[in-house]
């Protein structure tokens, strides 16, 4: 059984100071300023002293066809010296004057008590007289330049467009994994993440960089784990970092002494290790379950966790392709964004190059 549409009661308070309409005459005979028209399952009207909360106050100069437009709510009224007609349904055979609504914060007396209430004020001009026939036939097609009549009626055309839209292939703009990651970002991080996705070079750029720098840097497979539960372990980590930097520096010196033509054996700098150590010590909940790992000259990752806006100097810079989940060393320099990615159960921190 088809369910009936629920009807909401609308209260219109007609203010006709000249008493040229039936509403104004009834209000004047009762020594009241307003005539209330209540539209619901039935239509009723009576003189009242003041409007009610959430009511429409329609100020009119005299008889006319008025249509109150409040968003999707439309109320059509015919006010004449001898009668009143009103409806919230479609009423298209007559012309109406469209009246816009202005919400106002007021104090009115309601049920014997002064209350703060919102009323909606609208003013009609009386430019459309009651019961003026609408000469526009909805079934006729007007002569419009550049417009031809369709072979379908309006319902068939809408159904045709709907079927074409549903049958058309849809491109997946954002994966489920990306949406899950965005839930853990604040507004600034999400904005930076979107900017990083726009700037990240495509597959062709990544392949060119891989060919150009394939013989420049060697992979570094050293993995450093930080355990940050106790302060004494933090001190040991700092000492370990210093020893590793010293070892890497010695290796660089030996490489330079051996031959001036050989390239550096590692792209990991002291500044990078210090910055990474500080990020790990922040104990971000998103990284607590992951152990930290040094990035290789090129490699892959499982997922992007977050991109932070950080300014680092003298650090290895990477370009990466999020669709292929690959990253590639670009050079050593300065960055303004740092990407945090995960591979297996390891956290990899990648400064983003230009």
From Swiss-Prot:
Q: What GO molecular function annotations does the UniProt record carry, in alphabetical order?
A: RNA binding
Keywords attached to this entry: RNA-binding
Q: Which superkingdom heads the taxonomic lineage of this protein's source?
A: Viruses
Q: Where is the composition biased (Basic and acidic residues)?
A: 178-196, 237-249
Alphabetical list of Pfam families matching this protein: BTV_NS2 (PF04514)
- Which residue ranges have biased composition labelled Acidic residues? 250-260
Q: What does this protein do?
A: Single-stranded RNA-binding protein.
Q: What is this protein called?
A: Non-structural protein NS2
